Regions:
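A general structural motif
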Residues: 3, 143-144, 175-177
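Conserved active-site and cofactor/substrate-binding residues in soluble primary-metabolism enzymes
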Residues: 10, 14, 46, 105-113, ...
Length: 187
């Protein structure tokens, strides 16, 4: 791969939108500390599979559900070296509506950060800056894409989550995308 991949999730959501605006491809996913540098003896199998695919091909063709969900680490100290994460078997994706298969490029990120792009309650100037520089993609840019949403450890209240979804609806996102993937919340 000749291009250097930009990887990350959650706190890097705005970075992804900014880099996309200037034409640089990004990959929403693996973060350095919790994924690439997993403290157990090896990287988690699901993470390793997609990380290696990205590094060898420069893209990720198909996202399949993990059959296992892992508890997030609360401590990244030396005592955690070689300690496996608690795991639980799952049945894969949970389909809420529509077809279980859809395709398109992924666009989205942490719903908390996306909310901040529209709402000034946390950062008063954020919505103005995002509008001024066109950081949030226009409705046409969402056409045929897959909206990816995940939540932060702040565990957004249901009313705020609903408001965030309403911002996306008002921006025409749901009418334009080919599908929506929502990450499993932490804990």
């Amino acid at each position: 791969m000749t291009q250097k991949p930009f990887l990350g999730f959650s706190d890097t959501t705005i970075d992804h939108f900014m880099l996309r605006k200037v034409g640089l491809p990004t990959f929403y996913g693996q973060a350095f500390l919790p994924d690439v540098c997993e403290l157990d003896r090896t990287m988690l199998p699901y993470t390793r599979q997609y990380f290696e695919e990205l590094l060898t091909t420069g893209r990720i063709r198909c996202i399949r559900p993990s059959d296992t969900v892992y508890e997030s680490r609360k401590d990244f100290g030396e005592s955690q070296l070689g300690t496996p994460l608690a795991a639980k078997k799952l049945g894969g994706f949970r389909l809420l509506q529509g077809s279980g298969q859809f395709s398109g490029e992924i666009l989205g990120g942490c719903i908390d950060s996306i909310f901040d792009m529209f709402d000034p309650s946390r950062y008063a100037d954020m919505p103005e800056i995002c509008r001024k520089y066109g950081l949030f993609p226009a409705k046409e840019e969402w056409r045929g894409r897959i909206l990816l949403l995940e939540s932060s450890e702040e565990q957004m209240a249901p009313a705020k989550y609903q408001k965030a979804l309403e911002y996306l609806k008002d921006a025409g996102v749901f009418a334009a995308v080919s599908g929506v993937l929502v990450g499993r919340p932490m804990d």
